[in-house]
Regions:
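Alpha-helical packing segments of well-folded alpha/beta enzyme cores
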Residues: 48-55, 104
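Residue-level signal for nonpolar/aromatic packing positions in well-ordered secondary structure
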Residues: 12, 59, 78, 108-111
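The C-terminal cap of the DNA-recognition helix in HTH/winged-HTH DNA-binding domains
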Residues: 64-65, 110
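GST superfamily/GST-like fold recognition
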Residues: 26-31, 69-97, 102-108, 115
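C-terminal helix/juxtamembrane-tail motif
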Residues: 114, 119-127
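Short amphipathic alpha-helical surface patches that mediate protein-protein
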Residues: 17, 32, 106, 122-123
């Protein structure tokens, strides 16, 4: 999952750094705000959402070139980026303007062993 060729391994690394720097903070911060974990004024929330939308535009554009981030096969970069994008709804970021992202998410969800994050978290016993 780390890439097959030297070039693909380099692209995986680029995506991992991009995810950490450009995508994750700008999805998780507005998510934290909407869930009440952070108290900020509306301008701060909107700033993070706009930065997330900028990142999603980049992602959508790049995904127009192929089924996965670094080519025809999924890599750890796809898993990492998916993990952030999956929380966009909780940040009240609409993914409908990003058709390539939505299609890619569907492909990631069809990978062997895929599970939604909610299915992996411990559940409180209802009894």
């Amino acid at each position: 999952m780390g890439g097959k060729t030297t070039e693909q391994k380099a692209r995986v690394r680029e995506w991992m750094f991009w995810e950490f720097d450009r995508l994750a903070p700008n999805i998780y911060r507005p998510r934290a705000i909407k869930r009440g974990f952070m108290k900020v004024n509306d301008g701060v929330y909107e700033m993070y959402v706009n930065l997330a939308k900028d990142a999603l535009n980049v992602l959508d554009s790049e995904l127009g070139a192929g089924p996965f981030l670094t080519g025809s096969d999924a890599t750890i970069a796809d898993v990492a980026v998916y993990g952030d994008v999956a929380y966009a709804g909780e940040a009240e970021i609409d993914l409908s303007p990003y058709p390539n992202v939505k299609a890619w998410m569907g492909r990631v969800e069809k990978l062997p062993g895929f599970k939604k994050y909610a299915d992996l978290l411990p559940q409180q016993d209802a009894a």
